Amino acid sequence: MLRHILTAKNILSNPIFKFPNCLPFLSTVCCICRQFVGENLCSFADSPSSFEMWFHFLQLRSALNISSALRQVVHGTRWHSKRKSYKVLFWREITPLAVPIFMENACVLLMGVLSTFLVSWLGKDAMAGVGLADSFNMVIMAFFAAIDLGTTVVVAFSLGKRDRRRARVATRQSLVIMTLFAVLLATLIHHFGEQIIDFVAGDATTEVKALALTYLELTVLSYPAAAITLIGSGALRGAGNTKIPLLINGSLNILNIIISGILIYGLFSWPGLGFVGAGLGLTISRYIGAVAILWVLAIGFNPALRISLKSYFKPLNFSIIWEVMGIGIPASVESVLFTSGRLLTQMFVAGMGTSVIAGNFIAFSIAALINLPGSALGSASTIITGRRLGVGQIAQAEIQLRHVFWLSTLGLTAIAWLTAPFAGVMASFYTQDPQVKHVVVILIWLNALFMPIWSASWVLPAGFKGARDARYAMWVSMLSMWGCRVVVGYVLGIMLGWGVVGVWMGMFAD
């Protein structure tokens, strides 16, 4: 017995036990020693339980040694020496921007998911039709979002230099130009809608094509409202006000669910409009959001961006327009190439059957939810970089972008790996079709596998755009899109017969 106590004393004299964090382990050791003292001295050496206890005790010692080694490695990193400054950066600059953007994007995507639920109850043909039409709508929304990005950067730079007038003029002119462009675009798409759907849908069934055309013709009417909402929200974010866009877009999407639900399925004795109600509800909701954005800007809720309604009829200042477009056009080319490549891959998928089309659509919806924190951090990096460079703090902009990048990479990888085992459960919220669910599960696991490289292709380019360097990201996007997403996706998915998995492998190569 004395020999065992002395052995325990020698172990406890190890310097590792001097760390305050080891107090819980020391209490465990004391409990073991008390149990040893209470045992029969003669039978102690022959008791199997005593050897089992010492085996666990040695395991505890090994774990503590590993913990000590890890602690020394962490203490030797550059991150540990600057952890206080990173903590201040996270809570004072990243969080106030990223959290409202995250909540806003979450509202948008969750409402999109709920909209998908509403349509999915009409059948998988209806869901496939919405997916095909939305794959084209996303190209247009990507273009509007890119001009919105240019407005955000110019507003952030202008306010960083204390030039409120330039920020207001940039916002006003972006709203005017993009509204007029959206009206023209909606007219053209409405006229050529049938040809567009034939091009996008490929070998889809006639019923799916008819539903996709109906949805497209209804949603193009909302393009002017979508442009106003996106650009107005981007200007407010550039001014550092991320809560107002959150409230407006969150309310807008809740209204979309309520209005669409009533229009699709009816209310009381009214039977509703069926599938037509989905597109009509989205259009009405977007116009309500556009009116709310114009009202917020008119009353000067953010004093830096007070824009009266009559000011929209003033002459345009083309020097500011070209500054916005100098960022927005390369960014829009990148976004349009990205969504166009996605549209082409959708065409690859369109010939693989209705179940694969629906599963691909659902998997993209779930992946977008998983990627929400990274999208929010990417938007925050654009604003933070623009602000810092606006006041000439180049080194600080680099440090902050690097921090946001690693935060996004580690966070998204953890989320993707933790949610992948529940892919089947998430798919069940959308559909009960076993074939569709099988497709979704495979694609979500693939998404988790390649998540560690996502931030390098999303957050870093967002930071470059905040530095008014959108051209480099545009060229990289152009080469990778057509060289990888389209070519590799076609070779693997169509030529080699990998199906939708091959198409997604092309996306990961991109």
Question: Could you say what each language-model-derived stretch is?
Answer:
Residues 22, 30-33, 42:
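Cysteine-centered motifs
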Residues 54-101, 155-222, 270-329, 385-450, ...:
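Short alpha-helical transmembrane segments in multi-pass integral membrane proteins
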Residues 85-117, 121-122, 138-150, 182-186, ...:
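N-terminal transmembrane alpha-helices
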Residues 96-115, 218, 285-289, 293, ...:
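Transmembrane helical elements of multi-pass membrane transporters/channels
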Residues 102, 106, 110, 114, ...:
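Generic alpha-helical transmembrane segments of integral inner-membrane proteins
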Residues 109-128, 197-206, 262-273, 332, ...:
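Helix-terminus/linker motif at the lipid-water interface of multi-pass membrane proteins
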Residues 127-187, 226-245, 359-423, 454-477:
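Small-residue-rich hydrophobic transmembrane alpha-helices
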Residues 148, 218-237, 245-253, 278-294, ...:
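Short runs within selected transmembrane alpha-helices of multi-pass transporters and secretion channels
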